[in-house]
């Protein structure tokens, strides 16, 4: 639920749940102080009549409200890759051993470098090459292949191409990227080399939703590790890869559990 803040909202919503004989398992709420916007996430079990429940919410909540009733079910993702294996490999292993509750429907690459890795896990791999194509032409072919699998989310696991605005608009707040720096520092390419040149003492990674601006989408998860003057750019890169794969999988856990609200180009995690 997302709506203008008002007195007694939690009581009103929970009373509707009680009226429908639904048991509240977990409840989290937050008020954004500047805009007085109320956010609430409630986990329920019981026998649902979606239409009447949503109608009751509509007539109870203030004007300008939005709300969704989401079944607890396994999500589907399509992963996009280029040549780097660490983030993809981590997701494949976690998924295989039950550490990440998701269906990896397919992996799509603009190179075939990671095809053999993916096929070891009996997951389809598709090559959608960008050779001799404009960015718009390539992204159109990419979207067509993605849509064959009807994924809930698209994951950029070190996919090293910038997506065009039309592609991004097709999947609003459904494309998750891992960026190899602690944004907003060192956006774009070769962040570890620039971090080394700057003499930074921490390096990090950022998982975010993709929007029209390069590396400017709503941030879902970040983390850092300490480094010092003894680290070369290559050593920073190796250490950074560990942070990248951890941050990406943690962000996906939140997204797949429907815990992430997007508001004003930032996220609220409940």
Residue ranges and their predicted role:
Residues 30-270:
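One-carbon transfer enzymes
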Residues 6-26:
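Short amphipathic alpha-helix segments
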Residues 1-9, 47-48, 81:
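Short, surface-exposed ligand-recognition loops at beta-strand->loop->(often short) alpha-helix junctions
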